[in-house]
């Protein structure tokens, strides 16, 4: 992991001025050890805020004391944890990470391919997967899961915040739903999709 991160920092991050996302599948203690190494090299290379770890299953497999130790390292080095809520692995405790000050986001892992057929690019659907795998039942929990798929993703990608206020990017969708939790549970058809203020899809049909 040390040599890998050093090489990525030298050959990719510096050269192209990009962030690094490491997909970490190792479980339990070996995964925790890998997270420690990533945090160590992030600090040594001065890459705070430029590294993310996707999956990080080990965070959901270690004792609470070890989890808090790892979360502190992640928070100090500004390392983001990203999840796609895969069905075959232990999910990191997302809310507990946020409570410890760790940046967390959620997204799709290659949308749909031989790795997993369960993806459509629909982030409302992905938020439902997050909530289902995390056993979120209360409205505020479901909304938290949605926030990882929406605002947290924009923050990670360094995109402008979008609260539908004056000056925000005019990127938004229109759906028919009584509230956000219901929208996550049903992920209804997008009546309209706007990008930069331009209507690009209506009633499920692209307009370009």
Identify what each model region corresponds to:
Residues 29, 61, 115, 182, ...:
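Conserved protein kinase catalytic core
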Residues 68, 117-124, 187-188, 193:
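Short, conserved loop/turn and helix-capping segments at secondary-structure boundaries
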Residues 40-51, 78, 95-177:
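His/Asp/Glu-enriched, well-ordered alpha-helical/loop segment
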Residues 1-92, 112:
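Active-site core of metal-dependent hydrolases
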Residues 7-14, 38-39, 98-99, 121-123, ...:
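Short, solvent-exposed amphipathic alpha-helical segments in soluble enzyme
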